[in-house]
Amino acid sequence: MKKSILFSLTLIFTFSMHAQNEELPYHQIPEYPENYSPGNVVARMIDGLGFRYHWATKGLTEKDLTYKPSEDGRNIMETLFHIYGMSEMIKNAPTATPNVRPMDISELTYEDLRKGTLKNLQAASQAMADKNAADFEDFKVIFQRGEKQTPYPYWNMLNGMLSDCIYHTGQITLLRRASGNPINPNISVFNGRLRE
């Protein structure tokens, strides 16, 4: 019996360590695309967001997640939920997949939100790669409540969700600094790499 419990605990610990060590997307920004097609430019913007988000959210503590500078502001955890929801929309737009509302993500943990957001951004970037201007006509932001669908052109994604995610990622960087846990000072957002 003791051997069985010990084996089970060892197995759980091993899987837990593997999950923690799993390399998430955007540790560094991907290589440049071959050309400046409209899809590649948008993909690069998504990659820039992914890189910033990766480092803004890496190593957050419980104190960081619950920190809020004022009573009426969002804390970091609430901001992570908000960004995750928008990352779903960024991922769905190239395939015109409806964003069904309301979406219940209340059970997601910090780790779930971080991994899910990074994977969504990676999928969105890959979906945009090498797309031309004509392809954008088929990309839609679609909100669905019940049977009612409201579509918007991809333009709204650029000035809406994509810009909003960049904005909120900056807020996370500021809030974690205020809570005493600043991001790694060796990050170069210009080069999309960690300085050696």
Features from the language model and the residues they span:
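Acidic/histidine-rich alpha-helical segments that form the ligand environment
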Residues: 108-145, 151-167
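N-terminal targeting signals for Sec/Tat export/insertion, comprising classic cleavable signal peptides
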Residues: 29-64
